[in-house]
């Protein structure tokens, strides 16, 4: 696990096909661009329809490095690496009346140093735990990350799924500790929090709560895509509203609840979403899950979009993700949660190395981009010299600034290639048609989209799945143009046609620059010429006569008073 992020990023070189990267930042930039693009095209979609790969902190991290403060560095590296969905087990200790991360209580005969990591045993398993390491410690790290990425270009949504358990001290359930020794487990009662609400206090200003959702649902209204989602049972705000208007970053909900009602504080349910219907959580043990993908109808797609939110699939030691199943779950509209200790990847059939695991799976976790996309281009095109005669060759990397949908996902393609266009129906985001004719990305009519449809890009995993279904049903062939490009600014992918502006960097082409400055230049030139002419040919009789008059008056005055030279 040492130097995890460096290994993680370095190993991704091969995945993205970087032949001669000058430094690690080049590779990181590719991942950042892929993540930011997927976020940007989903900005108008409700947050419940967003999908991002996640990990179980317990299995992937704590079981390997221990339940201690040294794991905070790894958590930050995972956040910086782009992971947005997290699963975390919490334990309610009846002896201390506090919540803790360690899956075992701390006996009284252990060291009294709360900052020391010690081995504790529970239910015939050993755990390496630090008493002072609590949920609040983890949330402080999340807050630090939120503050450092609280900009329009870097802001993102983080989800945390909690599994809630408690310790059963009864002798019949636990063969390690007898019930009479219960009092020995109150030693570290000062560590941890008695309520979940207080455990999340450090991120309370950025946490989206059930009360926030209730307030939003009372005031929301919309048209277009918003009007479609307004009919949802859980009417969530869009990512744009959530991140850029409400300035929220985090949403938490309970995946599994095994604690009695008495363990919950009065405000816990006002902080965390406990509703069982809030999130659609599935498990790889359900063999029928993937069978339902690939044959969905429009009604099925609309049902998922309106009545299914935060779709996640969690694996386990018995049925871990495989390279094939992982990608299928992603394209099927699920957020895969890594919850096994070992995985099979090419050339390593059973690895436990988290850097190897994430290096392989993370680039394959985008529902939008195909694995390895958007690939690094050694040259960037200047739009002022974007000439079809120069860039028509499909091998020209400088023209690969427009995006097509292919069977594997979004792929950068030559803007001057001729393909058909993806046309989306207004106010019905899961209805697609493929244009009649093929043309370049710069076409004015976008292949003659049918009436009521317009050239667009899928904005969610369900939308892109429905588009794939339309391609299959219509018998069309890939690739298909989608409304996404980075023509104006390299690596800033935008929708709205070939000349849409990047929201993070304004650009002006050479031709447009001439158009902007030409009028001012002409006016300034005329003014300079007029001033020059005035200086040369100026004749001012009034001023000349005034000078003559005063000169004559002074001379006459001097004669009358006899002034000759300077008086002594």
From Swiss-Prot:
Glycan-modified residues: 23, 68, 94, 109, 174, 193, 197, 230, 339, 382
UniProt superkingdom: Eukaryota
Bilayer topology annotation: Single-pass type I membrane protein
Entry keywords, A to Z: Glycoprotein, Membrane, Signal, Transmembrane, Transmembrane helix
Record flagged with keyword Cell inner membrane: no
Family classification: Belongs to the MTC6 family.
Protein name: Maintenance of telomere capping protein 6
